[in-house]
Amino acid sequence: MSASAVNVNPGRNVVVVGTQWGDEGKGKIVDWLTDHAQGVVRFQGGHNAGHTLIIGGKKTILRLIPSGIMHPGVACYIGNGVVLSPEALFKEIGELEAAGVDVQNRLFISEATTLILPYHIAIDQGREARRGAGKIGTTGRGIGPAYEDKVARRGLRVQDLFEPETFAERLRENLDYHNFVLTQYLGVAAVDFQQTLDTMLSYADRLKPMVTDVSRRLYDANAAGSNLLFEGAQGTLLDIDHGTYPYVTSSNCVAGAATAGAGVGPQKLNYILGITKAYCTRVGSGPFPSELYDADNAARQEAIGLELATVGKEFGSVTGRPRRTGWLDVAALRRSIQINGVSGLCMTKLDVLDGLDEVKLCVGYTVDGNHVDLLPRGSSEVARCEPVYETFAGWKESTVGIKEWDKLPANARAYLSRVQEVAGIPIDMVSTGPDRDETILLRHPFKV
């Protein structure tokens, strides 16, 4: 069935979330679904998440701006749950506009969005350097410290830029606090008040036309019959509450975060699409039960894992870091399905498995001699998980570009069918290549 033949109901909302440790291919799927939406919303995270789009063979990486910006006429929203670096935002806008993309007339930023300031970046990088071998693996872009300030109620918001005297007063108070940490604890240079003030206020006039009451706009858009697509960043297993803590990001990456992070009611979320790769990857530190390959760990150097990393081009789109690779972990996937209330799955990068003699699927674990069928909550327990695998015959035929389920190799269909069975939820979409058209549609998220 072609996407163009689908009759889409108006005024529906779909949330796209990653079900693994991020890098599941959400950007491509959001781009595909945007053909059926009038607005795309970012509701958490910052410019630590890169969404890679391949459109007509051209690669675009978006870090802050919703993927819908590549579709003329689609409104794009940055919700209050995001932490915003104006410097990163305008760099991204400049790159897009240089490529002929209209951004500023279609981008709307919540007035309540928390700002990332230079001292957040300095603290983030200083902490990671101090941790040494025990580092968490942050991107060093100030995301975590910005969220800390938000929760501590000392964060500066976008709307504060439009009241310069108040902004300056609060900035000075914040710098008194953070510079003490920087100089006395982390042993790095202080951040200059005047330079920071001048830089941040210089963004105010450029930001102002885009700043608005996003929650109200989303409500009005739905009321007028517009479909909205909520674009999650990172993945469920990196969620600050539900991930492999403390090896997590600083925000809630689950579907429920769309309500608080964009200002919409829970009943407005009609369908939750969980994105999962046909195998698993992870960047940075933290437990990974089905791991096969880690460039930094001599004990994890299996050839098949390196092949997955090489064929799958598994390098971070923002950091450039090599990703750790492993077999698909359905026990972890089930945890994500439960937390998010996933309606259906989209399996990405199936083509990376082409040509393998056999494919394995982690269906549970042995932990301290006991069988476990769901990813544990604590990192120490996850680190003790020994994977229990089911093994499937591989397929030699190429799946690249296939657009119909029945045209997939029989062994690929058997693998996907078993994933559905063990996960307990249908696979509604399958991605068979990086281009938006290389997609199999089984159920349409905006139609279900």
From Swiss-Prot:
Catalytic-site annotation from UniProt: 23 (proton acceptor), 51 (proton donor)
GO cellular component term of the entry, any: cytoplasm
Residues reported to bind Mg(2+): 23, 50
Molecular function via GO: adenylosuccinate synthase activity; GTP binding; magnesium ion binding
Cell location: Cytoplasm
SMART domains, per the entry: Adenylsucc_synt
The keyword Chloroplast is assigned to this record: no
Cofactor(s) annotated in UniProt: Mg(2+)
Ligand binding (GTP): 22-28, 50-52, 323, 349-351, 431-433
Cofactor remark from the record: Binds 1 Mg(2+) ion per subunit.
One example of a Gene Ontology biological process annotation: IMP metabolic process
Binding site for substrate: 317-323
Record EC number: 6.3.4.4
A Pfam family reported for this protein in Swiss-Prot or TrEMBL: Adenylsucc_synt
Listed pathway(s): Purine metabolism; AMP biosynthesis via de novo pathway; AMP from IMP: step 1/2
UniProt key word Magnesium: yes
Keyword field: Cytoplasm, GTP-binding, Ligase, Magnesium, Metal-binding, Nucleotide-binding, Purine biosynthesis
Physiological role: Plays an important role in the de novo pathway of purine nucleotide biosynthesis. Catalyzes the first committed step in the biosynthesis of AMP from IMP.
Family under the similarity heading: Belongs to the adenylosuccinate synthetase family.
Quaternary data: Homodimer.
Descriptive protein name: Adenylosuccinate synthetase
Source organism: Paraburkholderia phytofirmans (strain DSM 17436 / LMG 22146 / PsJN) (Burkholderia phytofirmans)
